[in-house]
Amino acid sequence: MVPSWPSTGCWRHLPVVLAALTLPWTATLAAAEKSAGDYFVHSLPGAPEGPLVKMHAGHIEVTPETNGNLFFWHFQNKHIANKQRTVIWLNGGPGCSSEDGALMEIGPYRLKDDKTLMYNDGAWNEFANVLFVDNPVGTGFSYVDTNAYVRELDEMAEQFVIFMEKWYKLFPEYEHDDLYFAGESYAGQYIPYIAKHVLARNKEAGTKQWNLKGLLIGNGWISPPEQYEAYLQFAFEKGLVKKGSDIASKLEVQLRICQKDLAVGESAVDHPECEKILQEILKLTATRGKDNKLECYNMYDVRLKDVYPSCGMNWPSDLANVQPYLRRKDVVQALHVNPNKVTGWVECDGRVGQNFNPVKSKPSIDLLPDILSEVPVMLFSGAEDLICNHLGTEALISRMAWNGGRGFELSPGTWAPRRDWTFEGEDAGFWQEARNLTYVVFYNASHMVPYDHPRRTRDMLDRFMGVDISSIGGDPTDSRLDGEKGPETTVGGTAGNGNADQEAEKAKLSAAKWEAYRRSGEIVLVIVAVAAAAWGYFVWRERRKRRGYQGLASAENGAAGGVMGGNSGFRNTHGGRPRSDVEAGDFDETQLDSLHVRSPVEGQEDARYSLGAVSDDDDEEEEGSAAGAKGKEKETGKAAESS
């Protein structure tokens, strides 16, 4: 006779057995219970006095099989103008965090020091919800197994659409917003690819339409050939290099090598022989400073100099505060950063950039004509940027054919005029537009235009989105094109918080939110019912066993043993597979993180420029260390040794 468990033994093992029986359902329950409230940021260390901007932050899984999670930081709009809008912002790299945009460019706060935030006058969340995403996986606070970094642009875009679908399920009240993608530098590749996938998704049967209304790309890396050829032209026009000089002759030789490579090679996002042009400009124009240190031009703002070979990677000055702030334990906890992410925040992750090698991807310039047939696009450029300079952008526009014409030609021999832009009485730049494409040049601006001119870029954004402030009041800014005031926009504060239309919009959004919560509650009830049924079945079998059903008792002992073993197994696995490093903990955080431009230092061909990237080691300050570029990583050759 097979003995049955004593009554005391049965109840002693009951918690373990019940846990084993219900563990799969518990995992599902936990996922179902994840709601917008779990991402709500209740407080933000160092925030200025007064009401906190409503925000949510955290991770969304995009590739469960490789622990791929994208981090987001969402700020709600301060006012609703005539409609709801959402702007998704991406920085470049590849591998540079969009927290650059959040804390140094268009977010509601900027850092006064590494502990104190202050309001950003000109933040983009005045009339639009703004969503910052560390993209692709591995960038900033995002993470992924170290053998699963993204390599191609389509792969990146596919993962981003997954992120958006899951994000809208959490926040359904935003799914019907007018949607805009914005970013800078290497985001000039990201944004068109994401837009292509969003437009394709909208054409699929049974999908909710996302109201993609426009793209904004600042100092974008879009068409490599035009940008490579513009380096030397820009250097001549800015007086960095004198025409006819020995330096000019050497650079012209490298340009011809590049042109030959472009003529025989396939269209690609990067061409190593052409990358050397920028590297050579920085090397050959370096000079000795007052302290006898070798100095070079800042490739992101040629009005400035930097110690060679950094050439701009110590810029902007706000970087000195951003990394310490985002590594604070209380900040990490406030933003719901997964504690399993074992490395601290870095501006530009060199591992992401080194693995992102889109050899199968075409440059995004190939996508723009089709996108322009459906969606307005705005390209804007800071006039003092070298690495993704405005001359290259103007060349790609002139050569591109879209919507029945080429470039800004309105008719044979007639081009769209460049309209002088003044902002609050100052010359701000110029605007040019035709057939769904708008181009804006910002005078006295760097690679990171919003860093230099937050108010002007907010005015640009509001005009592009068609913001109408008549419904909310506020003093319109004095912004003119050729002396004429256009639609009224406002930069700074507004007179009031809205009208009946705004209240109706808020009521509609609230209803959508509660509907999502109701659906989540129904799912939870179903899961609890299933778990209860499993427990009831277990109790029924135990009672039958104690009544002496020998065969059943024998089977029950085997089943119980299997369940107990399963419980032990679950403790060591995740999702039915062995747990792997969320993000390789053996990564050497003393290495300098880089962008896409390899350092021009002699003997350091594997290092990369990373627009303003800083070392992961706060104490690493040695001259000659590798570095990279915050917007677009570019491969460069060797640099001459310092004399």
Curated annotation (Swiss-Prot):
The chain crosses the membrane at residues 520-540. Residues 541-643 are cytoplasmic. GO terms for molecular function: serine-type carboxypeptidase activity. SUPFAM superfamilies: alpha/beta-Hydrolases. Keywords: Apoptosis, Carboxypeptidase, Glycoprotein, Golgi apparatus, Hydrolase, Membrane, Protease, Signal, Transmembrane, Transmembrane helix. One of its GO terms (biological process) is apoptotic process. The keyword Signal applies. It is a single-pass type I membrane protein. It is an enzyme of class 3 (hydrolase). Its main location: Golgi. Residues 489-500 have a biased composition (Low complexity). Residues 31-519 are lumenal. The active site is at 185, 385, 447. It comes from the Eukaryota. Belongs to the peptidase S10 family. This is Pheromone-processing carboxypeptidase KEX1. It comes from Chaetomium globosum (strain ATCC 6205 / CBS 148.51 / DSM 1962 / NBRC 6347 / NRRL 1970) (Soil fungus).
